[in-house]
């Protein structure tokens, strides 16, 4: 097995090389903080002989599965170390993976360490899934799909170059210079464009998965400063 990144492997099966995506988790992308650590962690976990349990094929044609190293589930081990997040739609093992993520966050392991991406970042901020799944077909109500950032601090929160993301590898919103939330203030983020108040993501498709998702707020260096998960 050869490591491609923190949640992907290249596997030789009887002379046929296939790309494998670890099921139920998502590690930081190659250009994001903690990506190198996650890749090294996966490399260590599969250093000895590993067993692949195939469960699906993704939209890119990659095999999706669970990887076992002895009695250890590698997918879960990465989450337990804070080197990947648990996906809400991780199917039958989602509850166990989510529990592993909760433990990693509680103990500030890996990507959940306030100093994971350089100098320690402390921000008194919370995320609220205000309306992740509004009524009517999703593409018709992007302006009603809302996540809210709440400043619990006693001073202004400057969000310049902060990033709001979901569980996926693609949805990222970087805040423009001058985006500030006052003490005790709230900022609504809609998935559509041109909201009357707050900030518009201006996405052409829904951001938040109706079957459950997580929102993460990252400081400019990539440190996670707020996280919220919801289930339908």
Language-model regions: role of each:
Residues 1-232:
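Small beta-barrel nucleic-acid-binding modules, primarily SNase/OB-fold domains
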């Amino acid at each position: 097995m050869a490591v491609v990144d923190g949640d992907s492997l290249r596997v030789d099966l009887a002379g046929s090389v296939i790309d494998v995506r670890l099921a139920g988790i998502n590690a930081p992308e190659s250009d994001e903080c903690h990506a190198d650590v996650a890749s090294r962690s996966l490399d260590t976990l599969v250093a000895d002989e590993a067993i692949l349990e195939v469960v699906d094929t993704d939209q890119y044609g990659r095999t999706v599965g669970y990887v076992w190293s002895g009695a250890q589930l590698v997918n879960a081990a990465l989450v337990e170390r804070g080197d990947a997040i648990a996906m809400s739609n991780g199917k039958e093992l989602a509850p166990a993976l989510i529990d592993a993520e909760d433990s990693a966050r509680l103990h500030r392991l890996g990507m959940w360490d306030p100093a994971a991406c350089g100098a320690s970042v402390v921000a008194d901020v919370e995320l609220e899934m205000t309306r992740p799944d509004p009524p009517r077909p999703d593409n018709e109500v992007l302006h009603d799909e809302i996540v809210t950032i709440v400043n619990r601090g006693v001073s202004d929160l400057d969000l310049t170059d902060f990033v709001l993301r979901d569980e996926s590898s693609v949805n990222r919103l970087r805040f423009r210079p001058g985006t500030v939330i006052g003490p005790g203030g709230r900022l609504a983020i809609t998935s559509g464009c041109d909201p009357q108040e707050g900030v518009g993501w201006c996405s052409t498709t829904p951001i938040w998965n109706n079957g459950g998702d997580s929102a993460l707020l990252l400081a400019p260096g990539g440190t996670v400063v707020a996280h919220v998960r919801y289930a339908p």
